[in-house]
Amino acid sequence: MRNWIIGIAIAGGIYAASTVMRADRDETGAIVDEGSIDAFEMRVGDCFDDGSTFADDNPEVNSVAGIPCSSPHDNEVYAIFDVNVTSFPEGDEMARMAFESCKERFTSFVGKDYDSSALDIATLYPTRESWNRQNDREVVCAVYDVAAAKLTGSVKGRAL
């Protein structure tokens, strides 16, 4: 059993991309040069470093530090889906719902059951504000090494 689960809310609002270098992608959509990725433009297979993404004093995420998966990195996006409820969940229900839904998608991407894996789950999910103002329903599921070791290459199908 994991000691903690990271859940971060995707912030509403617009990220000032003009002040930060954006990640470059090739024709397949894979990141080839590191840079900023808007939280709403993340894709399955994107790798990124923590930076301040999962800081306790930074509960809202506008962007992440995208990095090619061939370089050492902290996280990899393995699923993105929309929450299928009509009203914003109360209390910790959004975090619980996001985690459980990400856990259901874990094995098919990683190739190993969550409970026996060396990887853990990080979730990014809507805030009440982004839910109401932007009709944000998107949840992003990412994996990271439970021992905080850097990952190299995609974890897809590697049964780590």
What kind of feature is each model-predicted range?
Residues 3, 17-160:
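Primary mode marks residue(s) on the alpha4-beta5-alpha5 output face of response regulator receiver
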Residues 10-18:
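Hydrophobic h-region of N-terminal signal peptides that target proteins for export
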Residues 1-8:
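N-terminal Sec-pathway targeting helices
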